[in-house]
């Protein structure tokens, strides 16, 4: 019996001319030239090959096959008379002696053209994802994902990390987002939860005596979709290190990530260590965001003094920030369009004025600005555009302005590179929007800077707890947050005191986090970790704006898998076995 194929559809070259070969793949296209001549494009995972049918019998045979049927072709390779330099196999063609149908496409028309599937409606693409993935332009992102994960795994092992899998069925835990719950059939009224992250397990591994842990970890959070966040399920390069600090984590990430970004990315330039470190409050003040895109050279300046007692009441006596953009050639229409985009994103209206070629202020709110006073705060060279944001959302708006106008203004963004930075010194506590009381700002298990002493001072009223910073850090690349990490609070006494400041006592901690609290009472090492998002990394490397483009089978924005029909109703028998009564149904 002959093997299923002798070559794939992407490997035949001129040196194979004269060889007898067998190819298999999808019949992508058929172009009939006459009664006994047709050109067939045969496609498999590796590429395409032109098949030249030169007999009326074989032509009649393939005319009975719909496009996207799978076939095998046995024939002889020959050099093309008219070569195609844009195709790897463009120097050759195969003249078939035998064609066999392997899998018939039963439909005369497709939901979309395979090679143009990215232009199709997203709902159609997700419904027929198995067709969408036949498009090489779509498939390449999944191949990239595989290669990046393999490289990450190899790099982590070279740094002496052990790959250890942690449970998928675990206990529900108050970690910020909503849990996906799994009813326990043998324990009526009780539920497992899918892990939002392996956070507690990886810290427990450190208390168990393991030194360096990692895994490509699946995480499950019932949260809404965004461009850089897929609903339901995502993956992260989860890591933790015992007897380690922030510096140890930084060293590993700075050693592992730049080579992978430079090798697999759309751009081949990535930050070299050490990455720039920016304090959280400084990032907000300078860039208007804790996720700055350092490829953009624009920064914010506080110009509140310019509008003290101003007749422009919208900005009068408020916090006002400005961004000066030199050598800006945008038209008024373009400026207004971009400001409208900023308003939609930030929920606040922005303003502008410009320095004309003569050096005079013009346009927008220029009449409300004193040039002499402004020139002491801002570089007002001719052709400088000044963007202005004021009020409670001034910081947020100015951050959006920088990320929106930076790419639009020539010379202010070095786009073709990956620029990493660390955001450090996050606040430990904040005032809750709903409660109006002190709450943890981010991870409650981060070690407070200053340890127990600073918590005791806050308890005694000697310092404001809002001034306490945590040993917590974010890794940001090109304005995208890749990960949060922290030096962990491994001391039960410090942990209890940290929770007491938010009105939770020792019994609350024991009840919410029993395993971790008990483990720490048996002597825990100082430890630290981080978990860069794999999906976000691949999205950046692929140059995609939507995270769904780099996931093999993504959900839509409403957390629905419309290809598989999930979520779906289940039978009453299944519900009875799980002791569940459905009290509400989704309206059709």
Q: Language-model segments: which ranges?
A:
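Class II aminoacyl-tRNA synthetase catalytic cores and aaRS-like
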Residues: 1-588
């Amino acid at each position: 019996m002959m093997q299923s194929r002798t070559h794939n559809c992407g490997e035949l070259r001129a040196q194979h001319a004269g060889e007898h070969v067998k190819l298999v793949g999808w019949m992508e296209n058929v172009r009939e030239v006459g009664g006994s001549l047709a050109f067939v494009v045969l496609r498999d995972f590796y590429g395409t090959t032109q098949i030249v049918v030169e007999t009326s019998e074989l032509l009649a045979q393939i005319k009975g096959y719909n496009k996207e049927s799978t076939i095998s072709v046995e024939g002889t390779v020959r050099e093309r008379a008219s070569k195609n330099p844009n195709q790897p196999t463009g120097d050759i063609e195969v003249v078939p002696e035998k064609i066999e149908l392997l899998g018939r496409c039963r439909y005369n028309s497709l939901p979309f053209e395979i090679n143009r599937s990215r232009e199709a409606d997203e709902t159609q693409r997700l419904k027929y994802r198995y067709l969408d993935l036949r498009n090489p332009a779509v498939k390449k992102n999944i191949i990239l994902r595989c290669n990046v994960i393999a490289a990450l795994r190899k790099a982590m092992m070279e740094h002496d990390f052990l790959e250890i899998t942690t449970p998928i069925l675990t206990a529900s835990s108050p970690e910020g987002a909503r849990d996906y719950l799994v009813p326990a059939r043998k324990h009526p009224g009780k539920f497992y939860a899918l892990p939002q992250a392996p956070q507690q397990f990886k810290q427990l591994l450190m208390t168990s005596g393991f030194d360096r842990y990692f895994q490509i970890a699946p995480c499950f959070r019932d949260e809404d979709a965004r461009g850089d966040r897929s609903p339901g399920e995502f993956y992260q390069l989860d890591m933790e290190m015992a007897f380690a600090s922030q510096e140890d984590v930084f060293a590993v990430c700075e050693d592992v990530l730049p080579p992978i970004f430079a090798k697999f990315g759309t751009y081949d330039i990535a930050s070299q260590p050490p990455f720039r470190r920016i304090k959280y409050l400084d990032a907000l003040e300078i860039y208007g965001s804790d996720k700055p895109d350092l490829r953009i050279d624009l920064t914010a300046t506080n110009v509140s003094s310019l509008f003290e007692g101003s007749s422009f009441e919208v900005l009068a006596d408020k916090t006002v920030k400005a961004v000066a953009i030199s050598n800006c050639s945008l038209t008024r229409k373009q400026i207004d369009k971009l400001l409208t985009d900023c308003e939609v994103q930030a929920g606040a209206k922005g303003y502008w004025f410009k320095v004309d070629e003569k050096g005079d202020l013009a346009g927008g709110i220029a009449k409300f600005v004193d040039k002499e006073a402004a020139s002491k705060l801002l570089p007002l060279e001719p052709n400088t555009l000044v963007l202005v944001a004021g009020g409670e959302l001034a910081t947020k708006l100015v951050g959006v302005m920088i990320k929106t106008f930076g790419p639009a203004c020539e010379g202010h963004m070095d786009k073709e590179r990956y620029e990493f930075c660390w955001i450090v010194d996050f606040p430990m506590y904040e005032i809750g929007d709903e409660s109006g009381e002190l709450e943890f700002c981010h991870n409650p298990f981060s070690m407070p800077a200053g340890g127990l002493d600073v918590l005791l001072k806050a308890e005694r009223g000697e310092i404001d707890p809002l001034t306490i910073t945590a040993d917590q850090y974010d890794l940001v690349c090109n304005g995208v947050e890749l990960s949060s990490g922290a030096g962990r609070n491994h001391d039960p006494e410090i942990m209890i005191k940290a929770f007491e400041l938010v009105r939770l006592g020792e019994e609350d901690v024991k009840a919410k986090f029993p395993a971790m609290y008990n483990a720490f009472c048996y002597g825990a090492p100082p430890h630290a970790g981080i978990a860069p998002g794999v999906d976000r990394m691949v999205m950046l490397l692929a140059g995609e704006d939507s995270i769904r483009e780099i996931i093999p089978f993504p959900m839509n924005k409403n957390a629905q898998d419309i290809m598989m029909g999930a979520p779906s109703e289940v039978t009453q028998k299944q519900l009875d076995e799980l002791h569940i009564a459905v009290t509400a149904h989704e309206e059709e």
